[in-house]
């Protein structure tokens, strides 16, 4: 059979639903089958542009910024607060990016959830040691 979400992704979604605010903002990749957006209804910085293009909506700048924040620690820190980020979700799609900043995030932010290839970092000031 076809599996859209792994067991770890489902566990991460359950954690998000039970432990984050409904209006929490997550930095993730913009894949159309995004775990955070699809399974939890939480907001992400930039979702899939698959349909937006045909409606004339300009999403490319936000899409580029989201990818740069996932791959460049300086860009991440320069935009983290102004974008209003609460969490960073690193899963299979995010790890496929060249240069994803997982080491930087692990060194600077607490891990709120981890299972297999899924890691969620908490960016709240009271969570940061």
Tell what function each PLM region has.
Residues 1-129:
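Extracytoplasmic
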């Amino acid at each position: 059979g076809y599996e859209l979400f792994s067991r770890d992704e489902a566990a991460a979604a359950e954690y998000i639903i039970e432990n984050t605010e409904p209006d929490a903002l997550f930095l993730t990749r913009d894949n159309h089958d995004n775990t955070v957006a699809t399974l939890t209804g939480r907001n992400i910085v930039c979702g899939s542009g698959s349909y937006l293009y045909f409606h004339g909506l300009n999403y490319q700048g936000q899409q580029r910024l989201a990818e740069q924040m996932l791959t460049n620690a300086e860009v991440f820190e320069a935009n983290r607060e102004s974008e209003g980020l609460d969490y960073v979700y690193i899963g299979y799609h995010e790890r496929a990016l060249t240069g994803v900043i997982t080491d930087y995030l692990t060194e600077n932010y607490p891990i709120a959830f981890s299972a297999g290839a899924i890691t969620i970092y908490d960016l709240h000031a009271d969570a940061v040691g």
